[in-house]
Design a protein with these regions (language model features):
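Short inter-helical turns and helix N-cap capping residues of alpha-solenoid HEAT/ARM repeat scaffolds
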Residues: 47-48, 81-82, 112-113, 146-147, ...
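Conserved hydrophobic register position within alpha-solenoid helical repeats
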Residues: 55, 89, 120, 154, ...
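Pro/Ala/Gly-rich low-complexity, hydrophilic intrinsically disordered segments
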Residues: 197-243
Length: 275
């Protein structure tokens, strides 16, 4: 049985990514998602990159997306010739993969397409594997990564690693020319250390030199999630709802590694001005 046939045989229900169907018998039917069988065929359509993109997107949000058959499809699709497919595959693998899949996403931080690099950085926020720390540090480095969105997401991904080299890299990145990166770095440092010293590199350096236990007050790490308020039409019965997520630990990160010290830690330091 071919790969596409196996995928079709294994699907059970795609629950999101509504699309408008022309010729549907009713307004509700017009917004039904493609069938699981069609989504699987789309995801493996070797002639149509747009179909592969849509198929992977549909499968990645289904309730069976974490099954090995589909995770393997997402892995293979990270090598697709089309950058859009690589990007959506990176997103799917980050959402449904295992800690070891971080090693698949890590090389994608060097992809020539910025959107692929962005999705790889976001995916690495959801997969915990210390082997990818050097790649994330490079993605945070202004001299090595030109896209500020990638640098910001890399900063947030690094916040799950309680290592001195990570703190050093984040403090250095406070000098980044992008305000968005500055705030992402600050948020990462707050999660790691429990301190809130603002955006001034010198203040963080002074504190870091003064402490022997930089991670004692850490708040613990949960990956950033998508959340938004309902739009007016989403209050209509049967309309698709926002794909809001619940914060959680990355795959491979133990709760023991993220909790405990914060319960008895001193209060966070007040923010200071200057940079």
């Amino acid at each position: 049985m071919g790969g596409a046939a196996l995928l079709v045989a294994g699907v059970g229900g795609c629950e999101s990514n509504m699309t408008v169907r022309r010729g549907a018998p009713s307004i509700l039917a017009a917004f039904e998602p493609p069938s699981p069988e069609l989504a699987a065929r789309m995801a493996t359509d070797e002639f149509d990159a747009s179909a592969r993109y849509q198929g992977i997107q549909l499968l990645s949000t289904a309730n069976f997306a974490g099954e090995p058959l589909y995770v393997d499809l997402f892995r293979k699709s990270t090598q697709d010739a089309d950058p859009g497919v690589r990007a959506v595959a990176a997103r799917a693998l980050g959402t449904n993969g295992q800690a070891s899949d971080a090693l698949t996403l890590s090389p994608m931080l060097k992809d020539k397409d910025a959107t692929v690099r962005l999705e790889a950085a976001r995916g690495l926020q959801r997969l915990h594997n210390p082997e990818v720390v050097p790649a994330l540090m490079n993605a945070l480095n202004l001299a090595k990564e030109e896209d500020e969105r990638v640098r910001r997401e890399a900063a947030l991904a690094l916040a799950q690693y309680r290592e001195p080299r990570v703190v050093d890299a984040l403090i250095t990145a406070l000098d980044d020319e992008s305000v968005a990166v500055n705030f992402g770095v600050r948020d990462g440092l707050r999660m790691l250390t429990g301190q809130d010293l603002g955006l001034a590199r010198r203040d963080w350096q002074a504190w870091y030199r003064s402490t022997q236990t930089p991670f004692a007050a850490g708040t613990g790490y949960t990956f950033p999630v998508f959340n938004r308020e309902k739009r007016i039409w989403e209050y209509v019965p049967f309309m698709p709802q926002p794909a809001n997520e619940t914060p959680a630990l990355p795959a491979g990160l133990s709760p023991i590694d993220t909790a405990g010290a914060a319960q008895t830690a001193p209060a966070a330091q007040p923010a200071q001005t200057g940079k």
